[in-house]
């Protein structure tokens, strides 16, 4: 228990020591007052200084009139220190009071300030006038609990939707045409590609496979007006091929083929060739069809949009090509394929469906002989049917489930929908009745069928005790099943079909739990309500009588708020209490009443206050009022409530969240309310707890049923797929390591050098990878046949170019003048017969000044060589010996001749620079090898 809550202003003053007197002196009624006592004077001074702003030391007088009987019960007068003696009354129709109290000693240390309130505020209820009138109800009637439910016993059969599909055998017939194309190189043969095509066998070949266990090695296809024939191994012969079992089988599929290896022959070198391999495939597999059997699916994943029971005349679903559908009766076929002399069986009705790539065949059977859309789930030997406003509740405590159905029902007999369960349901009901009820009960009507909200089907057979049946017969009441009172009609087939796919037992278990809890709670609440009603009636009578003693307390407890009430005849008048300023409420520490003797001294009288004196103010008022502390923080006006002083005395008064203890009418201490025991007046309601109900985990469908529910079995499909994969003979795989070995070694080496080496290795690796990629590209290009051919052409072209350059260079070396000056040879041949030779014996031929070497353009008027017209190479000059100067002059003449011959291109492009201003070209450098260039200016004498 914690400490008491702190007061608001924390100014609780201790009692004055002068008031702590021995009990003997208190009993005498005398009070010692010695002015010479220093500690008494000091305490009085401190108290006067502290409480002077709040409490006036003037004489106060008060007159209080009782609010109960309308008369005055007491009056007191007294005097005190000087001060205001006038009073300000606060009147009401029954109570009047002024602001004076009997003259007594009042100091600041005699008050407990900063009080708290917990439930009700400090208020005055005796001043209020009643405005509202109430009375207690005394005519309360209590009705007993009635469940209002009709229950019937019976036998219940619960059927679930049969989610296991109809499974049957299907035969498929097809031919696989495999075309392989290849290219033969010198030493290597490349498989360029292949195509695989599946085609359907014609019906006559299907009959041959079913009866004789073989098919043919050719296939004819008509496209437009043309026929295309393919032969196995390109033999161009139509031969029979026997069916043999394939090695790869599964639990639901058996496959028979004619060849196990694919045929292919390579062509000649540098030639393409395409071959054909033909394989007949007969497959015996399983197909599944789910209610309402509108389609079925094979284990390979193939779906047929037709009912397996369609025979061209019944009304079952069929959405395939009717022209490709055939039905044969009394059809003969082998019991198994791939065997020699296998037995033959006769199928009453066989269906064939042709598709472009496959032929399917299956046996047609009667649906009622092989299928049923309902399956028995549970048999409840003892069940209860409870009738409600719009529904029936079928309760099975053994299953801990409640099944809710509508009141509409169907009969088990004369209903074709339930032909598949009628016989078994009747046998089960008869067996349960003989074992459980024979001799005590009798059947109440015929079995009827209900459909639950969870999608289940309930077959209900009502029962009735033989004793009740005999009484009903004596009373003339016709015995009938409870279900016959309701209309029976045929439900919509579409609604029932939708209902059968929504089975869920969670709803049934939840409904059972709700019904169990509802019945228990409703019964308990009904009994509690009845007992509560009786208790309220008794309590009303008791409160009516107690209100005659203290109406305010009774009405405050009833309305749970402060109310001022008083009797007004046979009714009660109500009014609201007046709240005071909560911060100004203070309680006096001394409950003794003092009187003034003849000599003017204050002495304790024979009477003490029965309740502590309270000091307070009204809201929006500065005048201090006095009263006495009542119950629940109520302030009683006046201080006339006294009693004869009794010693020893112990009184505890509750104010807010705390209590004040007074011993011998003096304040002792403050007590926490939690430390005071409470008298418990609460009447406990004893209700039996709800009994434990262990819910059972119900399994509507087993794992096998759930696995078989889907027409597509993933396991079978994957096994079939893997079987096809194992049949692939040629699997090409190529693993290329893009990192060359030397690059990996370089990377390991660089990584050992640290961070710098690793970074450098990354750079070198990138560069090396790029180089390797480029080189690899060239290598792969040249290893390709087209790349090799291109390389050969390039090599031949390079050889031819080198040979031509070699011949040209050789011609230039052998005849440089003819090579570099081809026009000179042409001119020599043209003027060979007309040119004369001038012979110079002793001195060189004279040269004109214009014939000297100049850097400027040549003179267009100059013709011939030296003006004589003699041509070099003539017979005359050949025998003549020339000096060095003559050779020099000849070269100058050749230069001028070359410039003249090249003058024509210069005239075509006038914007180009003249030859004299252009730098020496390759031809000039070749012609002038071994010579030095002469100066542009100078006479012929300077040449020497």
UniProtKB/Swiss-Prot annotation:
<comment type="similarity">
    <text>Belongs to the herpesviridae glycoprotein B family.</text>
</comment>
<feature type="compositionally biased region" description="Low complexity">
    <location>
        <begin position="24"/>
        <end position="37"/>
    </location>
</feature>
<feature type="region of interest" description="Hydrophobic membrane proximal region">
    <location>
        <begin position="731"/>
        <end position="783"/>
    </location>
</feature>
<dbReference type="InterPro" id="IPR000234">
    <property type="entry name" value="Herpes_Glycoprot_B"/>
</dbReference>
<dbReference type="InterPro" id="IPR055341">
    <property type="entry name" value="Glycoprotein_B_ecto_C"/>
</dbReference>
<feature type="disulfide bond">
    <location>
        <begin position="142"/>
        <end position="533"/>
    </location>
</feature>
<dbReference type="Pfam" id="PF17417">
    <property type="entry name" value="Glycoprot_B_PH2"/>
</dbReference>
<dbReference type="GO" id="GO:0019031">
    <property type="term" value="C:viral envelope"/>
</dbReference>
<keyword id="KW-0945">Host-virus interaction</keyword>
<dbReference type="InterPro" id="IPR035377">
    <property type="entry name" value="Glycoprot_B_PH1"/>
</dbReference>
<feature type="glycosylation site" description="N-linked (GlcNAc...) asparagine; by host">
    <location>
        <position position="238"/>
    </location>
</feature>
<keyword id="KW-0946">Virion</keyword>
<dbReference type="GO" id="GO:0044175">
    <property type="term" value="C:host cell endosome membrane"/>
</dbReference>
<dbReference type="GO" id="GO:0020002">
    <property type="term" value="C:host cell plasma membrane"/>
</dbReference>
<comment type="subunit">
    <text>Homotrimer; disulfide-linked. Binds to heparan sulfate proteoglycans. Interacts with gH/gL heterodimer.</text>
</comment>
<keyword id="KW-1133">Transmembrane helix</keyword>
<feature type="disulfide bond">
    <location>
        <begin position="608"/>
        <end position="645"/>
    </location>
</feature>
<feature type="region of interest" description="Involved in fusion and/or binding to host membrane">
    <location>
        <begin position="182"/>
        <end position="188"/>
    </location>
</feature>
<feature type="compositionally biased region" description="Polar residues">
    <location>
        <begin position="89"/>
        <end position="99"/>
    </location>
</feature>
<dbReference type="GO" id="GO:0055036">
    <property type="term" value="C:virion membrane"/>
</dbReference>
<keyword id="KW-0812">Transmembrane</keyword>
<feature type="region of interest" description="Hydrophobic membrane proximal region">
    <location>
        <begin position="762"/>
        <end position="782"/>
    </location>
</feature>
<keyword id="KW-1039">Host endosome</keyword>
<dbReference type="GO" id="GO:0016020">
    <property type="term" value="C:membrane"/>
</dbReference>
<feature type="glycosylation site" description="N-linked (GlcNAc...) asparagine; by host">
    <location>
        <position position="426"/>
    </location>
</feature>
<keyword id="KW-1040">Host Golgi apparatus</keyword>
<feature type="region of interest" description="Disordered">
    <location>
        <begin position="834"/>
        <end position="878"/>
    </location>
</feature>
<feature type="disulfide bond">
    <location>
        <begin position="372"/>
        <end position="420"/>
    </location>
</feature>
<keyword id="KW-1160">Virus entry into host cell</keyword>
<keyword id="KW-0472">Membrane</keyword>
<dbReference type="GO" id="GO:0044178">
    <property type="term" value="C:host cell Golgi membrane"/>
</dbReference>
<feature type="transmembrane region" description="Helical">
    <location>
        <begin position="786"/>
        <end position="806"/>
    </location>
</feature>
<keyword id="KW-1043">Host membrane</keyword>
<feature type="topological domain" description="Virion surface">
    <location>
        <begin position="56"/>
        <end position="785"/>
    </location>
</feature>
<keyword id="KW-1032">Host cell membrane</keyword>
<feature type="glycosylation site" description="N-linked (GlcNAc...) asparagine; by host">
    <location>
        <position position="114"/>
    </location>
</feature>
<keyword id="KW-1015">Disulfide bond</keyword>
<protein>
    <recommendedName>
        <fullName>Envelope glycoprotein B</fullName>
    </recommendedName>
</protein>
<keyword id="KW-0732">Signal</keyword>
<feature type="topological domain" description="Intravirion">
    <location>
        <begin position="807"/>
        <end position="944"/>
    </location>
</feature>
<keyword id="KW-0325">Glycoprotein</keyword>
<comment type="function">
    <text>Envelope glycoprotein that forms spikes at the surface of virion envelope. Essential for the initial attachment to heparan sulfate moieties of the host cell surface proteoglycans. Involved in fusion of viral and cellular membranes leading to virus entry into the host cell. Following initial binding to its host receptors, membrane fusion is mediated by the fusion machinery composed at least of gB and the heterodimer gH/gL. May be involved in the fusion between the virion envelope and the outer nuclear membrane during virion egress.</text>
</comment>
